[in-house]
């Protein structure tokens, strides 16, 4: 090398292997070996190995099947439910018209009997009762006669064939309808465990405005979109592994 010339520095600075951290000479590092029969294994999520009860397995498989398989539009429409705020307002109105319990009915009949004994009419003792109508056959008859003012349909009825025709029937008869989450929630409206449908036929004068407002909001989400919704199939979504496989295949075909 010619005198006065320096060697060029390395392009990547050599990392110093020395650590400035002072170690306690009394302690020794004991790296763990997680092989079979060695150190205790770290905590992992092992829920996929749990043998779940049959009803849990069935509902999981049903959910996954509904995502994977192609679902016809008539059934796929039940995944589009009423939004939370509108549903809260709707249930608030329906709660005012819950059917009377056995105790309330007994009290009403006692009052009517006392009024009749005094020479009065039944209507004087107790005004006309307004109540939510339920029962599939009963509600279907009300829709066919155009007596229902608002119909709520549960989205998780099993088998779905029981209610799959109701949106089309409501649309044909011009009856406002909404698909809501939970047959159990509908059941609480009518003092039952579950209910597939619930309908209002009459409301008091003070609730007419609230009902009209709800109907206009609900129609915008369901009846007005009916023709559009019945064109769209549901499901057909692959799992993560299948999607990764398809992406890899597409990438290979593009590069070829």
Swiss-Prot record:
Described purpose of this protein according to its UniProt entry: Component of the ribosome, a large ribonucleoprotein complex responsible for the synthesis of proteins in the cell. The small ribosomal subunit (SSU) binds messenger RNAs (mRNAs) and translates the encoded message by selecting cognate aminoacyl-transfer RNA (tRNA) molecules. The large subunit (LSU) contains the ribosomal catalytic site termed the peptidyl transferase center (PTC), which catalyzes the formation of peptide bonds, thereby polymerizing the amino acids delivered by tRNAs into a polypeptide chain.
Naturally occurring in which organism (per UniProt): Saccharomyces cerevisiae (strain ATCC 204508 / S288c) (Baker's yeast)
Keyword vocabulary terms for this entry: Cytoplasm, Ribonucleoprotein, Ribosomal protein
GO cellular component: cytosol; cytosolic large ribosomal subunit
Quaternary data: Component of the large ribosomal subunit (LSU). Mature yeast ribosomes consist of a small (40S) and a large (60S) subunit. The 40S small subunit contains 1 molecule of ribosomal RNA (18S rRNA) and 33 different proteins (encoded by 57 genes). The large 60S subunit contains 3 rRNA molecules (25S, 5.8S and 5S rRNA) and 46 different proteins (encoded by 81 genes).
Location of this chain's protein in the cell: Cytoplasm
Gene Ontology terms, MF aspect: RNA binding; structural constituent of ribosome
A GO biological-process term: maturation of LSU-rRNA
Compositional bias (Polar residues): 16-32
Protein name (Swiss-Prot/TrEMBL): Large ribosomal subunit protein eL8A
Other notes: Present with 238000 molecules/cell in log phase SD medium. There are 2 genes for eL8 in yeast.
Family assignment from sequence similarity: Belongs to the eukaryotic ribosomal protein eL8 family.
Source taxon at top rank: Eukaryota
Stretches for region Disordered: 1-37
């Amino acid at each position: 090398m010619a005198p006065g010339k320096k060697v060029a520095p390395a392009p990547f600075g050599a990392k110093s292997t020395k650590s400035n951290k002072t170690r306690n000479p009394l302690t020794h590092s004991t790296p763990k070996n997680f092989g079979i029969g060695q150190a205790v294994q770290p905590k992992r999520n092992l829920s996929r190995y749990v043998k779940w009860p049959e009803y849990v397995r069935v509902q999981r498989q049903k959910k996954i099947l509904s995502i994977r398989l192609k679902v016809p539009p008539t059934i796929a429409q039940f995944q589009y439910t009423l939004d939370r705020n509108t549903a809260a307002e709707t249930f608030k109105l329906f709660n005012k018209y819950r059917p009377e319990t056995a105790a309330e009915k007994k009290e009403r009949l006692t009052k009517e009997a006392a009024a009749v004994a005094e020479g009065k009419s039944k209507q004087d003792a107790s005004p006309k009762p307004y109540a939510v109508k339920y029962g599939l056959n009963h509600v279907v008859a009300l829709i066919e006669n155009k007596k229902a003012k608002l119909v709520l349909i549960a989205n998780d009825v099993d088998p779905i064939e029981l209610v799959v025709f109701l949106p089309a029937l409501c649309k044909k008869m011009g009856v406002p309808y909404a698909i809501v989450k939970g047959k159990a929630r509908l059941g609480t409206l009518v003092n039952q465990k579950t209910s597939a449908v619930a309908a209002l036929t009459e409301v008091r004068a003070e609730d007419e405005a609230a009902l009209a407002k709800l109907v206009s909001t609900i129609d915008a989400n369901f009846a007005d979109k009916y023709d559009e919704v019945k064109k769209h199939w549901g499901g057909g979504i692959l799992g993560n592994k299948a999607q990764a496989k398809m992406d890899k295949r597409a990438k290979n075909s593009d590069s070829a």
